[in-house]
């Protein structure tokens, strides 16, 4: 069953944040990320949400720990404010 790591945070500059994200400093694929989706709030484009899909909870927890370490680094502190993580179990998804 798929496990999702939901990440929510405010970024100081979306374009700068996206450039760093695209360099993949944490090795998403190697860490077990199967798929991800990036979303922004319509009325606050500095608020970013991501869903990262993993095969299991252990991989999601390990990646969450890597994210926390990145956020406390100097680079992370310049780009990300008020980070929140949730590990969730998708119950149902349908295309209509």
Label each PLM-derived region with a short phrase.
Residues 15-17, 58-60, 93:
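Residue-level signal for secondary-structure boundary sites
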Residues 31-49, 72-96:
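Glycine-rich beta-strand-turn "strand-cap" elements at beta-sheet edges
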Residues 13-36, 68-72:
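Short amphipathic alpha-helical segments
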């Amino acid at each position: 069953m798929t496990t999702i790591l939901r990440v929510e945070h405010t970024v100081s500059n979306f374009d700068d944040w996206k450039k760093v994200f695209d360099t993949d400093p944490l090795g998403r694929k190697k860490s077990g990320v199967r798929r991800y989706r990036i979303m922004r709030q319509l009325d606050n484009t500095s608020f970013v949400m991501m869903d990262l899909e993993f095969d299991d909870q252990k991989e999601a927890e390990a990646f969450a720990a890597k994210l926390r370490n990145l956020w406390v680094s100097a680079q992370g502190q310049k780009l990300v404010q008020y980070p929140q993580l949730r590990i969730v179990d998708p119950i149902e998804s349908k295309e209509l």
